[in-house]
Amino acid sequence: MKIRPLNDRLLVKRLAEEEKTAGGIIIPDSAKEKPAEGQVVAVGPGKVSDSGERVALQVKEGDLVLFSKYGGTDVKLDGEDFLIMREDDILGIME
C-alpha cells in the first residue's frame, strides 16, 4: 500500500533502535526508547498560506531528520512502522 501525505505532512520511517549499549549490554525491548531520528519517505505538496499560495516544504524525500519524541502519529503499512507528522514536528535535518 502506498500513502501520499497531504499539505505539510511527511511520512517518516524511524531509524533502527539500538540493541546494545556502548558497553555491550543488551537492551530488552521493554527498556528501549523509540528513536527520535528517521528518514523521510514521502512529503506532501506543502502548506497553503493565508494568501492562498502553496509554500513548498524545506524537508525533502530521503532526508535524515531529528523530530520530537511525541510528534506524529504512528501508522503501520505493509507490516512496517512509520510516522505521519507535520513539518513543524521536525527539529532539524541531519547532514
UniProtKB/Swiss-Prot annotation:
<dbReference type="Pfam" id="PF00166">
    <property type="entry name" value="Cpn10"/>
</dbReference>
<protein>
    <recommendedName>
        <fullName>Co-chaperonin GroES</fullName>
    </recommendedName>
</protein>
<dbReference type="GO" id="GO:0046872">
    <property type="term" value="F:metal ion binding"/>
</dbReference>
<dbReference type="InterPro" id="IPR018369">
    <property type="entry name" value="Chaprnonin_Cpn10_CS"/>
</dbReference>
<keyword id="KW-0143">Chaperone</keyword>
<dbReference type="GO" id="GO:0051082">
    <property type="term" value="F:unfolded protein binding"/>
</dbReference>
<comment type="function">
    <text>Together with the chaperonin GroEL, plays an essential role in assisting protein folding. The GroEL-GroES system forms a nano-cage that allows encapsulation of the non-native substrate proteins and provides a physical environment optimized to promote and accelerate protein folding. GroES binds to the apical surface of the GroEL ring, thereby capping the opening of the GroEL channel.</text>
</comment>
<dbReference type="GO" id="GO:0005737">
    <property type="term" value="C:cytoplasm"/>
</dbReference>
<dbReference type="GO" id="GO:0044183">
    <property type="term" value="F:protein folding chaperone"/>
</dbReference>
<comment type="subunit">
    <text>Heptamer of 7 subunits arranged in a ring. Interacts with the chaperonin GroEL.</text>
</comment>
<dbReference type="InterPro" id="IPR011032">
    <property type="entry name" value="GroES-like_sf"/>
</dbReference>
<dbReference type="GO" id="GO:0051085">
    <property type="term" value="P:chaperone cofactor-dependent protein refolding"/>
</dbReference>
<dbReference type="InterPro" id="IPR037124">
    <property type="entry name" value="Chaperonin_GroES_sf"/>
</dbReference>
<comment type="similarity">
    <text>Belongs to the GroES chaperonin family.</text>
</comment>
<dbReference type="InterPro" id="IPR020818">
    <property type="entry name" value="Chaperonin_GroES"/>
</dbReference>
<dbReference type="GO" id="GO:0051087">
    <property type="term" value="F:protein-folding chaperone binding"/>
</dbReference>
<dbReference type="GO" id="GO:0005524">
    <property type="term" value="F:ATP binding"/>
</dbReference>
<keyword id="KW-0963">Cytoplasm</keyword>
